[in-house]
């Protein structure tokens, strides 16, 4: 299971009471998964963009589209995607990016 906080946030993002922080964590999780697939499974940029766009629409995260372009978002997505295992199903806890990725997720605001 990918980070429990990201998975939990993804489930919580479907409620009206979801905080902005929870939405951002869930969006980072979806985006990092897609970026990981681009790194390890040869997904095209178009396919990655479609995964993220579908997640935004399905989960009603439109309010976070601009934030997704921020340096905080892009850096966190990069760290998280690089900390994932080759299958993009979980974190590689031996990755040098693991601790920085966890810290970046916790720092989302």
List each model region and its residues.
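Sec/Tat signal peptide C-region and signal peptidase I cleavage site
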Residues: 7-13
């Amino acid at each position: 299971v990918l980070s429990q906080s990201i998975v939990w946030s993804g489930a919580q993002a479907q409620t009206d009471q979801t905080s902005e922080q929870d939405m951002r964590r869930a969006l980072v999780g979806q985006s990092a998964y897609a970026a990981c697939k681009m790194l390890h499974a040869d997904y095209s940029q178009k396919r990655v963009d479609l995964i993220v766009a579908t997640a935004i629409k399905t989960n009603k995260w439109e309010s976070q589209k601009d934030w997704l372009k921020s340096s905080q978002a892009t850096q966190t997505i990069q760290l998280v995607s690089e900390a994932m295992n080759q299958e993009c199903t979980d974190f590689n806890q031996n990755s040098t990016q693991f601790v920085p990725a966890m810290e970046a997720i916790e720092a989302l605001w």
